[in-house]
């Protein structure tokens, strides 16, 4: 079931829910439902959007995810994480991040340096330094975090170290539901369009029966119907993708709507909240700054 208000949507990828995520018992650890909440494109010092979305995290329990561009530019060079630390950083002990291009030295699109500041700031929560891909369990869900900065991790094709790791990880998974997170979307109606470099990851997840993919990069909110890696509708087996680059940085505008796009907004900061059940999930976009936009619904796992 899907409830959607307003023609376009701006969304922040928000995911909360974390029993046992960090090596110790989490509050609410006995509940059957887990919360996962978050977004991407977060800390931009000239914007107050990140402060507004951080307030949404303040009132939402569970695990926090990010989908890249955590340090989204404009911080002092000697303190690249300073704007993030003052708002979303208040939740760092329950945050599992992935990196984006702005988290790498040199900024957007850079392949001139590593993400030392990113790995130093998030520590073990970001996975092995230099790799940035890892997985964890959240209730009845298997959560996979990937690094879509392909040039920095030895590629993203089927023969790359990350894809070989992903295939092993999925083969060993015994959870009934799977959600994956990374920065660059394979499907998007935003200005940066589709990133074919992540096709192999989508294909591996699809073949393994994954349920949800969450991305950022485009500073918009968009939700797609379940589909195949080729973009064909697949209501019973396809992966539902969310683009939630609404964490606080200045927002983008949409281009032409892509096939299977079901909800879009480019005017609202916010976070995306998942309620993860053992056999399914609910999603709800939480708008910041008093916006009336909303998008919510539910689905079963495959």
Regions found by a protein language model. Name each.
Residues 28-82, 159-160, 168, 188-189:
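N-terminal active-site segment of His-dependent metallophosphoesterases
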Residues 58, 76-178, 193, 197-207, ...:
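Extended active-site neighborhood of metal-dependent phosphoesterases/phosphodiesterases
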Residues 16, 26-28:
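Cleavable N-terminal signal peptides
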Residues 41, 68-69, 100-101, 146, ...:
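Active-site glycine-centered loops adjacent to acidic/histidine catalytic or metal-binding residues
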Residues 2-11:
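Bacterial N-terminal signal peptides that target proteins for export
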Residues 36-38, 64-66, 97-98, 180, ...:
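Residue-level marker for buried hydrophobic side chains located in beta-strands
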Residues 10-20:
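Bacterial N-terminal signal peptides
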Residues 283-293:
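Short, solvent-exposed aromatic-acidic interface loops
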């Amino acid at each position: 079931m899907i409830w959607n208000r307003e023609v376009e949507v701006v969304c922040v990828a928000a995911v909360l829910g974390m029993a046992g995520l960090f090596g110790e018992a989490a509050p609410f650890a006995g509940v059957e439902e887990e919360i996962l909440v978050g977004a991407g494109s977060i800390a931009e010092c000239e914007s107050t959007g990140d402060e507004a979305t951080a307030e949404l995290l303040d009132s939402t329990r569970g695990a926090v995810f990010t989908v890249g561009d955590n340090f989204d530019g404009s911080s002092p060079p000697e303190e690249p994480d300073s704007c993030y630390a003052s708002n979303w950083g208040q939740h760092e002990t329950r945050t599992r991040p992935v990196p984006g291009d702005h988290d790498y030295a040199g900024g957007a699109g850079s392949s001139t340096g590593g993400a030392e500041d990113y790995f130093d700031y998030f520590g073990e929560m970001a996975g092995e330094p230099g790799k940035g891909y890892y997985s964890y369990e959240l209730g009845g869900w298997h959560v996979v975090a990937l690094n879509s900065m392909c040039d920095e991790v030895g590629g993203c094709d089927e023969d790359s170290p990350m894809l070989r790791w992903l295939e092993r990880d999925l083969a060993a998974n015994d959870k009934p539901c799977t959600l994956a997170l990374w920065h660059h979307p394979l499907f998007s109606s935003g200005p940066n369009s589709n990133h074919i470099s992540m096709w192999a990851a989508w294909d591996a997840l699809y073949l393994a029966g994954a349920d949800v993919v969450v991305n950022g990069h485009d500073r918009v909110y968009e939700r797609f119907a379940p589909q195949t890696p080729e973009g064909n509708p697949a209501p019973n087996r396809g992966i539902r993708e969310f683009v939630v680059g609404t964490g606080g940085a200045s927002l983008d505008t949409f281009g032409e709507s892509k096939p299977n796009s079901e909800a879009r907004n480019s005017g609202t900061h916010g976070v995306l909240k998942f309620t993860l059940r053992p056999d399914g999930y609910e999603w709800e976009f939480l708008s910041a700054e008093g916006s009336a936009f909303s998008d919510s619904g539910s689905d079963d796992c495959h």
